[in-house]
Amino acid sequence: MVIKKIKAYIKLQISAGAANPSPPIGPALGQQGVNIIEFCKAFNENTAQLETGLPIPVVITVYSDRSFSFITKTPPASILLKKAANIQSGSEKPNIINVGKISSAQIYEIAKIKAVDMTGANIESISRSIIGTARSIGLKVED
């Protein structure tokens, strides 16, 4: 196997199943000479099983021959927390005003989802991190 020379890494957050050539995708990939339509088709195919509109972080590796590969990550913890608590946005004053509640079981489920991206960390430490995120968006964590 021939090792390709890496030209660039591009990090984007794209809605699942909704990649299209418009900004920010088009300019970011076009600048590196990547076939934008090909990427959009591959990304949409890859994220078809996910909920449409869920923001998915993606790292695109562009090679010197203008080919590419990409890795999709799990949605941000704040998005998963807001979805679990059934709220649209976080609190303007997180430590003073709570906008919702979330159970420890829900925190654990989100931690299991995020564990895929956080290699080397155990579920307990990931759960603590997610509890911190929950508090920072104004969610009360219940046992």
From Swiss-Prot:
Post-translational modification, as annotated:
One or more lysine residues are methylated.
Q: Which InterPro entries match?
A: Ribosomal_uL11, Ribosomal_uL11_bac-typ, Ribosomal_uL11_C, Ribosomal_uL11_C_sf, Ribosomal_uL11_CS, Ribosomal_uL11_N, Ribosomal_uL11_N_sf
Known SMART domains for this protein?
Answer: RL11 (SM00649)
* GO MF, one example: large ribosomal subunit rRNA binding
Q: Does the keyword Secreted apply?
A: no
Q: Which UniProt keywords apply?
A: Methylation, Ribonucleoprotein, Ribosomal protein, RNA-binding, rRNA-binding
GO aspect biological process, one term? translation
Q: Any one cellular component term from GO for this entry?
A: cytosolic large ribosomal subunit
Recorded superkingdom: Bacteria
What does this gene product do?
Forms part of the ribosomal stalk which helps the ribosome interact with GTP-bound translation factors.
Kindly give the HAMAP family that the UniProt entry links to this protein.
Answer: Ribosomal_uL11
Give the multimer and partner information: Part of the ribosomal stalk of the 50S ribosomal subunit. Interacts with L10 and the large rRNA to form the base of the stalk. L10 forms an elongated spine to which L12 dimers bind in a sequential fashion forming a multimeric L10(L12)X complex.
Family under the similarity heading? Belongs to the universal ribosomal protein uL11 family.
- Name of the protein this chain belongs to: Large ribosomal subunit protein uL11
